[in-house]
């Protein structure tokens, strides 16, 4: 209030390293599967924020700055990048939704961009660089230190989108088993985040065939994984 904004500059320096992982296909940006992973984004880089499967932007940080500039009645064409000064006056701030809610949205929408940015939060929390490598090391390191066998895992990103990623079926089984088992209660919330067959997320229209005695709808919680010519599913089924 009482302050006239004359220019908008975006500090995009929080994340380090490249913003596009090895093994990603640039065409996936236009398919809505991924965006360059930049520290400043609006709606995970979607060009149509109300549509989960919207194509993504190739310049999400710049777009975020331009959106702010337009809201402040500053010419969006003048937006530039700069590092924040060590001191300065805070004019406004915004807080993200709680982590558990962002994890839920990530799982239900199978949102690769959210997976990458949350991976960088884990990296920061464990003292690692907020980069692709730092996030992978943080996530796999935390699982391994908790007793989850990650032997054979070789990842270059946190979302699993890269064609260079390698996980074994045993890795996935170990993660789900740890969440369902009695020894790692901190992982139990993972089960609640998994989509429900015939009910939510990427399983909302699957496992609907059969009658009430044979259908998996409502009984299966699982996470899908899909790449070209590759499909996987890992989860739990409630039995009688």
Regions found by a protein language model. Name each.
Residues 154-240:
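C-terminal soluble interaction/assembly domains
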Residues 31, 36, 42-188:
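A small/polar active-site loop signature that marks catalytic segments
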Residues 11-15, 45-47, 199, 239:
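Solvent-exposed coil/turn segments that connect beta secondary-structure elements
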Residues 29-31, 58, 222-227:
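Short Gly/Pro-enriched turn/cap motifs at secondary-structure boundaries
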Residues 10, 47-57, 196, 216-219:
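Noncatalytic linker/hinge segments flanking ATPase motor cores
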Residues 7-9, 39-41, 105, 117, ...:
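Generic structural signal for residues positioned in beta-strands
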Residues 1-38:
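Periplasmic/cell-envelope proteins involved in peptidoglycan metabolism and beta-lactam response
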Residues 25-29, 141, 206-209:
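Intrinsically disordered, low-complexity boundary segments flanking structured domains
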